[in-house]
Regions:
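Intrinsically disordered, low-complexity cytosolic terminal tails
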Residues: 1-19
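N-terminal accessory/cap region of cofactor-dependent oxidoreductases and related radical enzymes
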Residues: 17-371, 375, 394-529, 533, ...
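Secondary-structure edge/capping motif, primarily at the C-terminal ends of alpha-helices
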Residues: 376-380
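Mobile, glycine-rich extracellular loop/lid and propeptide segments
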Residues: 385-388
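Hydrophobic, mid-to-C-terminal alpha-helical segments
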Residues: 556-559
Length: 692
């Protein structure tokens, strides 16, 4: 692969610099520069703070014994005279103060025309593999191979499948041109000093639990080179040419390589599954619940293929004395940017090998499953393989829910949005709620978090020295890089501050150039262009409609966007789109200023908040729902609530010390006292002990 970027030059304010040789200014002695004085002041403050923390913070305690201040709603209030608990605070239910209600008219079409007949056993304790029978009134809701939910009707130019056009009838501007004009070389090297890089792989891992739509077979196998799209004597425009992303001749990156088009593969529509629906409808291949289906599989055949059928454990193999997912000889992803990968993992998610961070977490949870299965079997020797497996699978799904709602989402959305959208407190199951993933979420709002993907991933050794730096594009389709680097990659995510929130993606995921194998030419990859095009592919409404849907004032002119978008960006939008009503949703979502302590703007928070409320309230098996055949006991729920990602990482790796709040950036050099020995991170399984 050829990239147009050097290694990150730390003297630059930009994350990445193009290959342009610029003469360096004559350097002054460093002790005469203002930053050196500032550095000395900060160093003195840091040392003083460290000494205070070291003296007063518990150093040998357990993360489970720290007395954190609890939210007011969960606080137990005592009367000095009677010493009784105030009943007002006895139980706090998750209730949103803001709810968006779907305006779409097509959500029921699949269930009327194509849904299979399903027979359910209401007394089943465990989830089905494909997600059916979660909702007993609507057994197909949220199941694999059912459509994404829509909050608003799809918008296609022909009402069926062709890309939306502008109000004046002109095509929408090229996704690549939009990205270049708004964001090119505007990525700033700025770190999030509160959070580490672990937010990125967890977000990707979570996405693969709830979403998977395969490529349309009509153009998934077409050649990467698209020169034939410019042949003028064609009587019919090839399918792949209609959806390709146009690149301007003066493109600052691809112009010099004569790259004029990006290949774009559309999502596979329902008609490919013998269900012709209008407008174009996309089926989700994964279950639409947070249930660890990406670990275990979304159908019984896949799930059975991953099992040993002994002691409830999953198949694995040992490589370099470490446990990894089994080999998948039928993997579709064998050639990455660094060459062929002989390692191809098998997991519940078909895309396990797509991204090294996803492969890391798949292997992490494989190991944790097998650890828990061993412990549960010891606790209950009489249990069958099936019972140990199902109970462990049930616990793993609950753990992913706890980590997501208690630790991940509060950072992404902030406390105010968490409360506003009903994402805190005890879950009350509501069978009238369809938990299915919104198309506006998977093709729009959640993709906006690609703006925190860093320019590089660090691999760190046990003594915290960086042994390798890799660009995100290098870890695509290269699962072999994980072997021998498992712990190093985890340390790198933990010990590297995250990318600060900013509208632009980093340049190393928007300007990738690679040589086309066996051809005299180049092609490229731009994640932002693909995200914009994916929204058009799946018929997302434009930004103005989405913000109005979320309760914001509808803009009549571009300047009406100034409540959330900077005037500079508004001027650029004017040069790109015909009217304010034409702006792509993801563009508006990226440009919105974050509010209320969140990492996203209000229209993004609205869609993310709605989706995760429905994942929670519409899931009969959600971990803290009571009164169902599959409900955990109160003691089991209490044990699950104490778990963090640190428990999983400590048990499933060779790391020795971890902070309790795993996503928070804790520099080992200055804050080692709040990194606890991994022996402290143990899930209390005693509530699962069965007494005969």
């Amino acid at each position: 692969m050829v990239t147009i970027f050097k290694k990150v030059d730390n003297s630059s304010p930009f994350e990445t610099d193009p290959l342009l040789s610029k003469s360096k200014a004559e350097k002054q002695p460093f002790w005469k520069k203002p930053w050196f004085t500032l550095f000395i002041v900060i160093l003195i403050i840091a040392i003083a703070t460290t000494v205070i923390v070291y003296i007063f913070y518990p150093k040998n305690g357990s993360p489970n014994t720290i007395n954190f201040i609890k939210p007011e709603a969960n606080r137990v209030i005592f009367n000095v005279a009677t010493l009784t608990r105030n009943p007002v605070y006895a139980e706090v239910k998750a209730q949103p103060t803001s709810r968006v209600m779907s305006l779409a008219t097509t959500n029921g079409d699949y269930f009327k025309k194509c849904a299979p007949f399903v027979t359910c056993n209401p007394d089943d304790k465990y989830r089905t593999y494909n997600g059916s029978c979660n909702n007993l009134q609507n057994p197909n809701w949220g199941a694999a191979l059912t459509p994404f939910y829509r909050l608003m009707d799809a918008e296609f130019n022909d009402g069926n499948e062709t890309f939306r056009v502008q109000l004046d009838g002109r095509p929408l501007p090229s996704a690549r041109v939009v990205g270049v004009k708004l964001f090119y070389m505007k990525d700033i090297r700025n770190f999030d000093h509160e959070n580490n890089e672990l937010l990125v792989p967890w977000g990707q891992f979570l996405t693969h639990d709830i979403s998977f739509y395969p490529d349309d077979i009509r153009n998934s196998s077409t050649p990467a080179h698209l020169d034939h799209c410019f042949e003028k004597d064609k009587t019919k425009i090839p399918f792949e040419c209609k959806t390709a992303i146009m690149i301007a001749k003066d493109d600052p990156v691809y112009g010099q390589y004569n790259v004029s088009l990006f290949k774009f593969v559309r999502s596979m529509p329902s008609v490919n599954f013998s269900c012709p629906l209008t407008p174009r409808t996309i089926l989700n291949r994964n279950t639409q619940y947070i249930d660890a289906s990406h670990v275990y599989g979304s159908d019984k055949k896949i799930a059975d293929g991953l099992r040993t059928f002994e002691n409830g454990k999953l198949r694995s193999r040992i490589l370099k004395n470490e446990e990894y997912c089994p080999q998948n000889p039928d993997s579709e992803f064998k050639d990455g940017p660094l060459g062929k990968s002989n390692v191809q993992f098998a997991a519940g998610d078909k895309n396990v090998n797509q991204n090294l961070a996803i492969a890391l977490f798949q292997n992490l949870f494989l190991r944790y499953h097998n650890h828990l299965a061993d412990e549960i079997q010891k606790l209950n020797p009489s249990w069958s393989d099936e019972k140990v497996y199902q109970e462990t699978r049930r616990i793993i799904g609950a753990i992913i829910q706890v980590i997501t709602y208690e630790h991940f989402l509060p950072i992404i959305l902030g406390d105010e949005y968490m409360k506003e959208y009903g994402l805190t407190g005890q879950t009350t199951y509501d069978p009238s709620i369809n938990s299915a993933l919104a198309q506006e979420m998977t093709s729009g709002a959640f993709r906006a978090l690609h703006n925190i993907i860093p320019a590089k991933f660090n691999f760190m050794s046990a003594n915290y020295s960086i042994v390798d730096e890799v660009e995100p594009s290098r870890v695509l389709l290269q699962p072999d890089l994980l072997i021998g680097n498992f712990d190093n990659m985890l340390r790198g995510f933990l010990e590297t501050p995250g990318r600060a929130v900013q509208p632009s993606y980093n340049n190393l995921i928007t300007n990738i150039v690679f040589k086309i194998p066996h051809l005299d030419g180049y092609s490229g990859f731009d994640l932002l262009s693909y995200d914009i095009q994916r929204g058009r592919d799946n018929g997302l409404p434009p930004y103005n409609k989405m913000r109005h849907f979320c309760g914001l004032k509808k803009a009549n002119t571009f300047n009406d966007l100034s409540d959330l978008i900077s005037l500079e960006d508004i001027e650029t939008l004017k040069s790109l789109y015909s009217t304010v009503h034409d702006i792509d949703y993801i563009i508006g979502a990226l440009l919105e200023k974050p509010r209320n302590g969140s990492m996203v703007g209000p229209s993004t928070a609205c869609i993310i908040g709605d989706s995760f409320y429905r994942f929670k309230a519409g899931d009969r098996f959600f971990y803290d729902v009571l009164g169902q055949p599959g409900s955990f006991t109160p003691a089991q729920i209490e044990a699950l609530k104490k778990i963090t990602l640190s428990h999983v990482m400590c048990t499933s790796s060779n790391l020795n010390h971890m902070q309790k709040e795993t996503f928070r950036f804790v520099d080992h050099r200055w804050m080692s006292s709040i990194k606890y020995n991994c022996k402290s991170y143990k899930l209390d399984l005693s509530p699962w002990k069965e007494f005969s």
